[in-house]
């Protein structure tokens, strides 16, 4: 079997790319190692930048999003008895962010792709890649107990951090940058109405975050050791710690409810470059991971594939590789800006092991500056809602 673009991975990056290519009349096949149910049930972040929402509208995929989403116009940051209110529309000429779970985005993209007759092969495990430096790459994969071969003009590696695409790039070609922070996030989902705003807290006991997934479902986090055992955290212990870190000691603001999911997420930053080797292009988590503090993972993946789709459209229409040749540099410029922002927010809001009194006071001074400076809040806001897409 042959296709123009073989997309490995049916996460947000691969699915958005498939729709962008379909719109331009470019053939593609999506190969996904996991089952459809597994992919659709993976709970991930739910903060969508304006550009991501706009793209879903352009592609005609926003009907359910418009019905079920929530719009956030601000975030709050609490520290030392003070509250920093960052109002997005005021600071970014009207922009907002949208709350709609990544798993819901994935469900919408898969349903629309299948309805349009777009081929997605689930439980299709890639076992080998060949000819990446030629003009007809090949993919070997297992499906229903048999090995299959797919040839293509281009491979889009959208298979995540643990996928097969990035390791297929020769070690002498690829450079990786990895930073693991000395803490993790203990996160829960609960059946309880969320507080009014997405709220971050820097407390002497550590970071905390109150967010929402729906009007009836809350998503909360507290900073813990990276190797923390979830079994050490009873529901009561979690709620008590969250109240303390959110300066809600009288328990009058945060509503407790039944916790139905609990887990520890590592906090790390990872970047691999170049994001291209021959006829294979990396996108999304296959090329980069950012700390969750800035809520950027899905949105950064969407930006990658928008740039890639423009390059592929130019290539298949005119034969020009000019945009594709710039793909990696264009994406990495944005990636490093997003890494910088996510690193800044992570450093600003967390307690680090061994923090000296000097470092703690500098951190508090930075928060106090944010409290008093509109320009500082504007910088946070414009990054939070999403930087403009650069011309490639």
Over which residues does each language-model region extend?
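Generic enzyme active-site microenvironment
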Residues: 30-31, 157, 201, 283
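C-terminal helical "tail/cap" subdomain of flavin- and related membrane-associated enzymes
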Residues: 295, 310-392
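Active-site-adjacent segment of FAD-dependent monooxygenases/related oxidoreductases
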Residues: 41-44, 49-116, 130
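Glycine-rich FAD pyrophosphate-binding loop
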Residues: 22-43
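Conserved mid-domain beta->alpha element of the FAD-binding
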Residues: 10-23, 109, 157, 263-344
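Beta1/beta-strand and adjacent pyrophosphate-binding region of the FAD-binding site
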Residues: 1-13
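Conserved FAD-binding catalytic core of PHBH/FMO-like flavoproteins
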Residues: 111, 118, 124-128, 133-263, ...
């Amino acid at each position: 079997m042959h296709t123009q673009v073989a997309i490995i991975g049916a996460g947000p990056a691969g699915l958005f790319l498939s729709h962008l290519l379909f719109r331009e009349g470019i053939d593609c096949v999506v190969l996904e190692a996991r089952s459809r149910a597994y992919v659709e049930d993976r709970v991930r972040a739910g903060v969508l930048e304006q550009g991501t929402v706009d793209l879903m509208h352009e592609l005609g995929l926003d009907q359910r999003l418009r019905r079920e989403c929530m719009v956030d116009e601000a975030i709050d940051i609490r520290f030392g008895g003070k509250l920093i209110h960052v109002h997005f529309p005021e600071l970014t000429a009207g922009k907002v962010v949208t709350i709609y779970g990544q798993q819901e985005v994935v469900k919408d993209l898969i349903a629309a792709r299948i309805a349009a007759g777009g081929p997605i092969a689930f439980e299709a495990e890639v076992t080998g890649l060949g000819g990446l430096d030629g003009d007809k790459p090949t993919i070997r994969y297992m499906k229903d107990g048999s090995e299959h071969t797919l040839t293509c003009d281009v491979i889009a590696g959208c298979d995540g951090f643990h996928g097969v695409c990035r390791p297929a790039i020769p070690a002498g070609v690829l450079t990786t940058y990895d930073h693991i922070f000395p803490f993790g996030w203990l996160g829960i989902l609960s059946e309880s109405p969320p507080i009014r705003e997405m709220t971050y807290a820097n407390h002497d006991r550590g970071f905390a975050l109150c967010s929402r997934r729906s009007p009836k479902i809350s998503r909360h986090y507290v900073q813990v050791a990276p190797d923390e055992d979830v079994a050490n955290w009873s529901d009561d212990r979690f709620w008590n710690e969250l109240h303390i870190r959110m300066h809600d000691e009288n328990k009058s603001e945060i509503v407790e409810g039944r916790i139905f999911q609990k887990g520890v997420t590592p906090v790390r930053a990872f970047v691999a470059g170049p994001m291209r080797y021959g006829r294979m292009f990396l996108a999304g988590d296959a090329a980069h991971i950012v700390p969750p503090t800035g809520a950027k993972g899905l949105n950064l993946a969407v930006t990658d594939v928008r740039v890639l789709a423009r390059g592929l459209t130019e290539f298949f229409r005119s034969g020009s590789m000019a945009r594709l040749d710039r793909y990696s540099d264009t994406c990495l410029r944005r990636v490093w800006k997003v890494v910088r922002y996510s690193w800044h927010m992570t450093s600003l809001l967390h307690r680090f092991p061994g923090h000296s009194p000097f470092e703690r006071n500098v951190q508090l001074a930075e928060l106090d500056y944010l409290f008093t400076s509109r320009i500082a809040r504007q910088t946070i806001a414009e990054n939070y809602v999403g930087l403009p897409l650069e011309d490639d």
